[in-house]
Amino acid sequence: MALPVEEWRRSAARCWAALEPALRERLAAAPLGEALRMGCGLFGPEEAALQRLCRRARTGKEPAAARFYREEGNRQFGRCCYRDAVRLYSQAAAHEPPRSPEVALCFANRSAALFHLGHFEVCLEDIARAESHGYPDRLLPKVLLRKAECLLRLGRLQDATDTLTAVENKMAVDGIMTSPIHRMLLKKLSQLKTEIHEGSCPEPAREADGDVQRESEIWEENGSISGASSSLSLNFSTERGRHLVASQDILPGQNLLKEKAFVSVLCPGEGDSLLLQDSSETVWDTRVTNADLYCHHCLKQLLASIPCCGCSYAKYCSQNCADVAWEQYHRTECPLGALLLTLGVFFHVALRTVLLAGFSEVSRLVEWSRDDSNKDLCNAEAGGEHPSEALDTRAGRKVIPGCNDNGQYQSSYQAVFNLLPHVEKHSPEHKFLCMLSIVAICKKLQETGLEAAVLNGESSTTGSEQKTCGKTSDELSPELMIMAEAMLRHVLQLQCNAQAITVMQELESGDGAVVNKKPVRLATAFFPVLSLLNHSCSPNISVSFSGTAATVRASQPIPSGQEIFHCYGEEMLCCSSEACAFSVSRERLSQRLLDLQQQMEKALELLRDSKADEAIKMLLKCQIDARNFLSPEHLLMGELEDHLAQVYATLGKWQEAARHLGRSIQLVEMHHGPSSVEMGHELFKLAQILFNGFAVSEALSTIQRAEEILSVHCGPQSTQIQELQEMKTCLLELPRSILQRT
């Protein structure tokens, strides 16, 4: 959810409509700072409505929720659903107070589930966490035995021996134990000692490395654009604004840019399950969202999360990420969690941007932008009457907006600040909504006593110990007004400059013989250098992500002098490319299309419930319905073929699956092109089907095509390329007689 919840948007719209026409005109024409000053007085009557909406977004630590998730975790553990148990114990830990026996119990329970999943190193980390948070002394022998078994599985015999000695000493100090549980512990202790003595431990287990992409390509970095290849140059014109062009011929697959986001904020997920409907009955949600799956700081996929000490929302992959996030921004965001979820990701990004930049830098640039002598420099890209290059009168030379004093364009706050907000292109009503929302954030900072921390960057206590010694006032302090002006600028910038960080996420389906993945929006970010690329629905580059870092590669040959184009998504910008030259009104078909999509989703639910035959019947009916109002070339027709292929693959009917996927591939090629990343993902699925169906020659040729395409878009070290190479190796190792037959 990029923008606020619908109820707040409606509330702001009613407030705007009720204003006197003259005041609306003044607000519409006012500079950002002046609009905010007027908005402070208008926010008061709307504050209660926003507070009521914020109560639906539950981000505090609630003991009742902790009990619920822990009991659900125990239930899943009893069913041997260890992965679900890990997730539920993590949610329970997020609701427990830090350094308490209750949170220690969550970590200990989670360590047991991790042990059964074979994640022995992570299991050891959870055992250490349980001990450090005050795990009950009487229960310690059980987790110490688990620790010894992990060490044994990892081949660390001496450490395992030392741990068993500690267990023996502990049990001896506690005296004679005759209960069934104690007898079981003694039996386990004896068994582990025997295994160590006989040296019968298995080969040391290797933990999965995860989706780590290793870059081996050597390239020459650009001296003027941080993170960019020397094959690019930065140009400027009134028509195109700042843009990147090829300074030499570029080949497909060539790396053009490697940039870490200046700021990124995790998107909660498609379901927005943290935003509950008004209800007197408390219902805890067990659905999985991005907030449960990825680190809120580095965006690494989570296995055993570290919860924030102050809220139940933020989760991290390591204590280091938790500490860095706290020091840089989360100590301020933590008490504002419900408000930020209610207002949406764009406002969260705006706040985090100014927190990372710091008041000193924000103040410098806001004051600079207010200076009349710099208005041409700030607005040089707006088009019209401004010269093709802006003149920095202080330096006496022409510069491109966003560059530093040395003429370098860096991935810095100055570059972020100089991205165009396109104030004149936003409707007055939308600007009013954004202004009210920014005022709400700053008022909350003022009321909760966080203003000093925001302005001075001073360290503060943990979230559970935050002091609410703030003040209430209809006006913001001059310093907060500066921060508010910058935040409002950033929210308006995001409409055209936000970059979605996406990941390929596996979909739940069938027996796992064929891995079905789809791109999922993981986070919203500012990439100052990547934002130099103008939009086109026919881009000539592909962007892939690893954590918060973006890698840009050429997706086709780019001759010297040609502009580099990126597709930001159809909701962002108007586009003059050939792909967008014609638009068809779908208003009359929208409801029918929505009904069809809902039926397709029901079919996939049947597949997830192992009702493949029923899923096929429903999908075939969807096909008949679709043919009545969609063209044969519509992308949804391809999705139907893709889903049918998925169901037949689950049933092991590989030829049928390949036939349906082949039809899907034809439509993907028609819409996205034969060398598109979408084509690469479809060929990857076809390769899996042909591999499982033992169609060796077809599988090998499909693997080669998929490799050629995906290596261009994702790099030669991506996970999918490695899986394709493993399939190829397996097929080539088959006996020659089998290869000749197939």
From Swiss-Prot:
Its EC number is 2.1.1.-. It holds the Pfam family zf-MYND. One of its GO terms (molecular function) is histone deacetylase binding. Zn(2+) 1 binds at C295, C298, C317, C321. Residues 230-569 form the SET domain. Zn(2+) 2 binds at C308, C311, H330, C334. It is an enzyme of class 2 (transferase). It catalyses: L-lysyl-[protein] + S-adenosyl-L-methionine = N(6)-methyl-L-lysyl-[protein] + S-adenosyl-L-homocysteine + H(+). CDD domains: SET_SMYD4. A zinc finger (MYND-type) spans 295-334. Keywords: Cytoplasm, Metal-binding, Methyltransferase, Nucleus, S-adenosyl-L-methionine, Transferase, Zinc, Zinc-finger. InterPro entries: SET-MYND_domain_protein, SET_dom, SET_dom_sf, SMYD4_SET, TPR-like_helical_dom_sf, Znf_MYND. One of its GO terms (cellular component) is nucleus. S-adenosyl-L-methionine binds at R110, S111, A112, N418, N534, H535, Y568. It is found in: Nucleus; Cytoplasm. Its main location: nucleus. SUPFAM superfamilies: HIT/MYND zinc finger-like, SET domain, TPR-like. GO terms for biological process: heart development; methylation. Belongs to the class V-like SAM-binding methyltransferase superfamily. Protein-lysine N-methyltransferase. Monomethylates PRMT5, modulating its transcriptional activity. May also act as a histone methyltransferase. Plays a critical role in cardiac development. Acts as a key epigenetic regulator of gene expression during cardiac development via its dual activities as a methyltransferase and negative regulator of HDAC1. This is Protein-lysine N-methyltransferase SMYD4. It comes from Gallus gallus (Chicken).
